[in-house]
Amino acid sequence: MKIAIDAMGGDNAPEVVIAGVEKARDANKELTFLLYGDEAKIKPLIHHDERLTIIHTPEKINSDDEPVRAIRRKKQASMVLAAQAVKQGEADAMVSLGSTGALLAAGLFIIGRIRAIERPGLLPTLPTVDGKGFVMLDVGANAENRPYHLLQYAIMGSYYAKDVRNVENPRVGLLNNGTEANKGDKMHQEAHDLLAAAPGINFVGNVESSDILNGPADVVVTDGFTGNATLKAIEGTVRTVMHMLKGAIYEGGLSGKLGGLFLKGNLKSMASTFDISSYGGAVLLGLKAPLIKAHGAADAETVYYTLLQTAKMVQNGTVTKVADYFDAHPEVAEAKTAEKA
C-alpha cells in the first residue's frame, strides 16, 4: 500500500511530516510512502529509509497562493506531483498538511470525482462527551449545496463511519434549526425527505448544533457554509472553555490551586476527550481515491494518526464501496433530476 505525502505542506513541514511518517511506517509493515518535496530538507530528517522514497520537487504551494492558479501553474509543486501520483495509480492515497483550498483544487482537477458525485464534501471527525466522536460533512469544501448533495454526503459518511470508525449501522442526522421534520428552509426540508426515503441509510432525523457534541448521530450532514461555521464554533468554544478553566485555577489563589490539584485527573480526562488529534485529518469524500487534509499546525502524532486513518480507508476499499453504491442505486443518482423537476 503506497501513500503519497506532500512533505512540504503545513506550518512545521517537513519535520513533523517525516516524524509522523516514520512512526506510521514502523507501526504498519504494509505501508510504503512516496515523499514529495525538497530532498535537501527531507533526507537529513529520515532516521531509517526503509519503505520511504523521496521524489524531489523544486516547488511548493504556499498558504497565500491562490488555490486554483497555484495548482495549474506550479506543475512541479510537491502537492501537485503527489496528486498526480494518485491519479496515475502510483499511489493509493494522498495526505497533505498544506493549503486547504489548493488541496481541494488538486483533488477535483487532478485526482477527479467519482462519476455520480457532483460536489465532494470535507469530513472531519469531531468529539462527543462520551468519547466516541462523530463525523460531519460538508465543513467547507462548498459554499452552497443542494438537497441531493446532502443525500450523497449521508451515503459517503455512512460508509466512512463503518469502515474507518467501526460503527455498525451509523445513525445519520441532518443539521437543522430544530428536530421537527418540517423545520428549516426549503432546501433542508427537501433534504430531510430525500434522506428519509433513501435505501441503506439509518436516518434519525434533524439534529441541532446545540446537541451534536452529545452524540445524537454518528454522521451529521450539512451544507458547507453551515458546516464550516459550526466546526469553527466548536473549536473556538473548546479552546475558550479550557482557557477559562485554567485561568480560574491559577487566578483563584491557594483555594483555586488546591481545587485544581484535586481536579487534575478530571481536567486531563476532559482535555483528552476533546483533543481531536487522535482522530486524524479531514477527508475529501467523493474523489476517486482517498485524499486527507491534516491541520496545518498538526504535530507528528496527528500526522501519524492521519496516516493510520488513510491506511484504513485504503484497506477497506471505502471509495470503491461508495462508487458501487451509486452504481447499484440509480434512483439515488436520479434524486438530482427529481429535485429540479
Swiss-Prot record:
<dbReference type="GO" id="GO:0043811">
    <property type="term" value="F:phosphate:acyl-[acyl carrier protein] acyltransferase activity"/>
</dbReference>
<dbReference type="GO" id="GO:0008654">
    <property type="term" value="P:phospholipid biosynthetic process"/>
</dbReference>
<dbReference type="Pfam" id="PF02504">
    <property type="entry name" value="FA_synthesis"/>
</dbReference>
<keyword id="KW-0963">Cytoplasm</keyword>
<dbReference type="InterPro" id="IPR012281">
    <property type="entry name" value="Phospholipid_synth_PlsX-like"/>
</dbReference>
<keyword id="KW-0594">Phospholipid biosynthesis</keyword>
<comment type="pathway">
    <text>Lipid metabolism; phospholipid metabolism.</text>
</comment>
<comment type="subunit">
    <text>Homodimer. Probably interacts with PlsY.</text>
</comment>
<comment type="function">
    <text>Catalyzes the reversible formation of acyl-phosphate (acyl-PO(4)) from acyl-[acyl-carrier-protein] (acyl-ACP). This enzyme utilizes acyl-ACP as fatty acyl donor, but not acyl-CoA.</text>
</comment>
<dbReference type="GO" id="GO:0006633">
    <property type="term" value="P:fatty acid biosynthetic process"/>
</dbReference>
<keyword id="KW-0443">Lipid metabolism</keyword>
<keyword id="KW-1208">Phospholipid metabolism</keyword>
<comment type="similarity">
    <text>Belongs to the PlsX family.</text>
</comment>
<keyword id="KW-0808">Transferase</keyword>
<dbReference type="InterPro" id="IPR003664">
    <property type="entry name" value="FA_synthesis"/>
</dbReference>
<protein>
    <recommendedName>
        <fullName>Phosphate acyltransferase</fullName>
        <ecNumber>2.3.1.274</ecNumber>
    </recommendedName>
</protein>
<dbReference type="GO" id="GO:0005737">
    <property type="term" value="C:cytoplasm"/>
</dbReference>
<keyword id="KW-0444">Lipid biosynthesis</keyword>
